[in-house]
């Protein structure tokens, strides 16, 4: 058997679809005159490509509806985290298909390209042929990531070092987090590129981040004789794994009664949190790390305010790069996040506001600012709003909850879990409120 031949019993667990197998019409006839199956496949392909970008079910369904309406059909879709079942109807005929993805992720650059495609199709799609539509989608689908693994590692390093400062850490914690998160996310990206399973990627990345933090901290301590209390910053090194995107989109989907998608996204986020925190706890037990309070920093309230602005920007910018945002998009999200997250922290520190209420106002601010900015830059709302509030997701609280529960300190663990839950619930509520106020299409059902 030649090296080019593949045995009949070898195949991908999730088989790839050759979309051109469905094309039977010529490349001259407008797509609106193609048969039902050809048009329905276009609807499904757009939907599954949108879903692969990590966006919520409302946006996926809206895109499928635009394509269906442009091609003269009615579409009804049931959308989950990694699968779509949909039916297209036209002239007393119907075509039902089920499509699925092997995994899920976030790609804001591809999402932006698909949004532009949708606008073009809505305006002039009636004159396109089936072949032209597939060619445009092929071009979008074949687009590669904007950043190499080492770049994504640096983005996580920047984000987590800024994150740990916002949590109360100092220069030692920031330096060690930079190293730990950088190595951890680099390893995670390499494993993802090799199509490793979800649990393995999470476990190895978190363990690598914690161990890299410990090694760098021991080196700093040996060179500069710093306090052992700085070891508490190891939590910050693993915060790149926190699934802020599915957490927030879960709440958005539930608000639109897309129960399947909302619950699946919530379950996916909980799985990641559970595996990451348990692995972090196991590593901490093995190498004797403890999540103590950070050492107080000798900074005035004004200095905190002035430093929180650039730290929040760097954190959001780094997370946006991890979501494959281009530099301009990441900068836009970073500027919004700098204002929204600094406002949240100042409301807690100076206004003595409960953390949940401050999270709501911070997310509301981010949503309102994004609504203003997107009219000028044209980016999808979700690609700048969610990255701008991911930094507000209380990964530290979640880890401390699991750490204490693991030590059977149930009351302390429950306290941290309650604090985390309140913030996690209020973050999507803030975005939902902003969306209701600024988006007429979102405001109404149907």
Features from the language model and the residues they span:
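Hydrophobic, membrane-inserted alpha-helices
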Residues: 155-163, 181-188, 208-209, 311-319, ...
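Soluble N-terminal domains of membrane-associated systems
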Residues: 1-134, 139
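Structural signature of hydrophobic alpha-helical transmembrane segments
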Residues: 164-180, 229-243, 295-311, 352-365, ...
């Amino acid at each position: 058997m030649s090296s080019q031949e593949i045995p009949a019993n070898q195949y991908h667990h999730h088989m790839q679809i050759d979309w051109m197998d469905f094309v039977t019409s010529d490349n001259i006839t407008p797509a609106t005159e193609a048969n039902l199956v050809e048009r329905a496949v276009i609807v499904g392909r757009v939907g599954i490509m949108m879903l692969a970008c990590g966006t919520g079910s409302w946006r996926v369904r809206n895109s499928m509806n635009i394509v269906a309406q442009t091609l003269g059909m009615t579409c009804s879709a049931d959308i989950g985290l990694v699968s779509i079942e949909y039916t297209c109807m036209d002239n007393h005929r119907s075509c039902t298909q089920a499509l699925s993805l092997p995994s899920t992720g976030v790609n804001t650059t591809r999402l932006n390209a698909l949004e532009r495609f949708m606008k073009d199709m809505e305006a002039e799609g009636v004159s396109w042929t089936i072949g032209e539509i597939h060619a445009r989608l092929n071009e979008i689908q074949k687009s590669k990531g904007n950043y190499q693994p080492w770049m994504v590692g640096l983005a996580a390093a920047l984000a987590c070092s800024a994150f740990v400062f916002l949590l109360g850490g100092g220069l030692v914690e920031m330096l060690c987090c930079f190293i730990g998160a950088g190595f951890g996310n680099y390893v995670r990206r390499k494993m993802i590129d090799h199509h490793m399973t979800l649990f393995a990627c999470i476990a190895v990345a978190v363990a690598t981040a914690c161990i890299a933090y410990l090694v760098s901290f021991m080196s700093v301590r040996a060179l500069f004789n710093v306090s052992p209390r700085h070891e508490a910053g190891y939590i910050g090194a693993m915060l790149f794994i926190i699934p802020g995107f599915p957490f927030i989109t879960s709440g958005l989907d539930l608000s639109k009664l897309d129960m399947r998608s909302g619950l699946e996204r919530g379950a996916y986020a909980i799985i990641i949190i559970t595996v990451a925190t348990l692995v972090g706890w196991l590593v901490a037990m093995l190498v004797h790390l403890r999540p103590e309070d950070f050492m107080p920093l000798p900074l005035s309230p004004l200095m905190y305010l002035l430093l929180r602005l650039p730290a929040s920007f760097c954190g959001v910018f780094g997370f946006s790069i991890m979501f494959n945002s281009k530099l301009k998009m990441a900068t836009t999200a970073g500027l919004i996040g700098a204002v929204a997250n600094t406002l949240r922290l100042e409301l807690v520190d100076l206004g003595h506001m409960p953390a949940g209420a401050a999270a709501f106002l911070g997310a509301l601010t981010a949503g309102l600012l994004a609504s203003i900015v997107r009219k000028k830059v044209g980016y999808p709302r979700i690609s700048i709003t969610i990255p701008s509030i991911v930094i507000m997701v209380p990964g530290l609280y979640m880890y401390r909850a699991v750490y204490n529960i693991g030590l059977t300190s149930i009351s302390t663990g429950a306290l941290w879990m309650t604090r985390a839950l309140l913030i996690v619930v209020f973050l999507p509520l803030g975005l939902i409120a902003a969306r209701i106020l600024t988006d007429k299409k979102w405001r109404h059902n149907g």
